[in-house]
Amino acid sequence: MNLNTKYHGNIEYEEKDVIYFPKGIPGFEELKRFIIFPVEDNEVFLVFHSIENEDIGIIITSPFNIEKDYEIQLEEEQITNLKIQDEKDALVLNTVTLSSDIDKITVNLRAPIIINIKEKIGEQIIINSDRYKVKHPLFKEEA
């Protein structure tokens, strides 16, 4: 199958690549089916793209690229909804807000996207803690 994206050109994918989000994601609750693909020539960023709306693609990254000790605790309901039986089946990703000013690029560590890679089910959750920021700087200033 083909997806003609606004910013990344034509992307080929198979049905097995599609991740289902029963609740959609905040701001796009009506969109339920997404694929993930790498940003060309970049090992840190991925694209989280709707296959239902060719204009909706979000840059994402692993939180462990930013915070080595990143840790979340899923609630029982979330574990059940995502059908997670082993933590190895859970992939954690976070959305990135881009800017032409590199110092203003941020990562939302408070609302991770959790994906059961075995079942191809996902959900964006909101962490009820001040430990992580919604706008965490991607690049910290060196002291």
From Swiss-Prot:
InterPro entries: Flagellar_assembly_factor_FliW, Flagellar_assmbl_FliW_dom_sf. GO terms for biological process: bacterial-type flagellum assembly; regulation of translation. It is found in: Cytoplasm. Its main location: cytoplasm. Pfam families: FliW. HAMAP family: FliW. This is Flagellar assembly factor FliW. It comes from Clostridium botulinum (strain Langeland / NCTC 10281 / Type F).
